[in-house]
């Protein structure tokens, strides 16, 4: 099964390094009161100090996470990278190129302003100015630490593949776990505590559907979930919030997606979405008096005598 599965996948590896803007704390960085001393190294470590404003590095972290989310939308984590269906790779390559270009622009801007950024950080913390200045990295080192690139390749197992079979066969479980994580985040962020679901909240749900569809060959229990979601989506309103019975069906679908075991049970036909929907409350029975008030007399036809009939002559003397 491993070879057939790998033939349908490409591996995307994100290679992104970010300068931390931190250095290890040293004993000389502390001003100790008379008689005070630092704990020995085998008891506690000194940790690190920030030698640069973290806000100045925020764009690099943002772009790294954006690249990771992009790959997670269509693929699953695999051997330090992402296993992406071959027919979906064109969806992410242009975006990864864009992220790489933006990373390079942010890097150049940061390096151009490195001296000013570190000067401002020292000025903001004058009591630690000497400790920060001593720890500042040369700009050449910072330039080498800020890198973004990606590689896409096909994996070809060797004759002696070790535990590769187990890792490939485990990608289905990884898919269920990742979908459940994202479905739980969607529930907490956009659904919990509400009695309707907005059109905006449907977008991440549709992305989960597309991810499951693209990777359905990893586990035979995935396709029934895709079909159930398709059946639901075609009945949802195109505008406005989802309410009433469709809301309950959507909630039940999210509930299944948020649990790997429930997704497997659904795929095996052991769990139906309708089982998780609230049953409609029966209408209360009307009191007997109310029923009587609602009764109406049904008019009966009036029987009239046939006055036009002829009286026999023998009736008279």
Predicted regions and their residues:
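Amphipathic alpha-helical interaction modules
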Residues: 38-61, 185-237
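Context-gated lysine
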Residues: 8, 23-24, 41, 49-50, ...
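Amphipathic, heptad-repeat alpha-helices with coiled-coil/zipper character that mediate oligomerization
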Residues: 52-74, 137-148, 170, 174-181, ...
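Long amphipathic alpha-helical segments with strong coiled-coil/leucine-zipper propensity
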Residues: 86-194
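Leu/Val/Ala/Ile-rich N-terminal alpha-helices, chiefly Sec-type signal peptides and the beginnings
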Residues: 1-136
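C-terminal structured domains
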Residues: 202-317
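A sequence-level detector of short, solvent-exposed, charge-rich linear segments
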Residues: 122, 129, 133, 190, ...
């Amino acid at each position: 099964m491993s070879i057939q599965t790998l033939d349908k996948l490409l591996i995307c590896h994100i290679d992104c390094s970010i300068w931390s803007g931190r250095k290890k704390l040293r004993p000389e960085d502390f001003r100790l009161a008379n008689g005070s001393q630092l704990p020995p190294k085998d008891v506690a470590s000194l940790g690190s100090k920030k030698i640069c404003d973290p806000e100045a590095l925020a764009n690099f972290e943002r772009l790294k996470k954006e690249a990771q989310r992009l790959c997670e939308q269509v693929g699953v984590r695999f051997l330090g990278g992402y296993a992406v269906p071959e027919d979906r790779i064109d969806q992410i390559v242009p975006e990864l190129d864009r992220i790489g270009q933006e990373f390079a622009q942010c890097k150049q801007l940061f390096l151009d302003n490195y001296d000013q950024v570190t000067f401002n950080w020292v000025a903001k913390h004058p009591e630690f100015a000497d400790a920060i200045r001593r720890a500042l990295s040369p700009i050449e080192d910072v330039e080498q630490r800020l890198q973004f690139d990606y590689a896409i390749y096909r994996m070809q197992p060797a004759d002696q593949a070790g535990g590769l079979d187990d890792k490939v066969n485990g990608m289905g479980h990884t898919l269920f776990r990742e979908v459940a994580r994202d479905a739980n985040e969607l529930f907490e962020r956009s659904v919990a505590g509400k009695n309707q679901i907005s059109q905006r909240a449907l977008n991440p749900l549709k992305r989960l559907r597309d991810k499951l569809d693209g990777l359905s060959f990893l586990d035979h229990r995935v396709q029934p979930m895709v079909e159930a979601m398709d059946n639901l989506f075609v009945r949802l309103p195109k505008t406005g919030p989802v309410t009433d019975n469709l809301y309950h069906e959507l909630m039940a679908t999210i509930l299944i997606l948020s649990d790997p075991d429930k997704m497997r049970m659904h795929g095996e036909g052991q769990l139906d979405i309708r089982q998780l929907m609230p049953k409609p409350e029966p209408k209360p029975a009307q009191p007997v008096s109310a029923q009587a008030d609602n009764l109406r007399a049904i008019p009966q036809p009036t029987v009239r005598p046939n006055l036009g009939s002829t009286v026999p002559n023998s009736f008279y003397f």
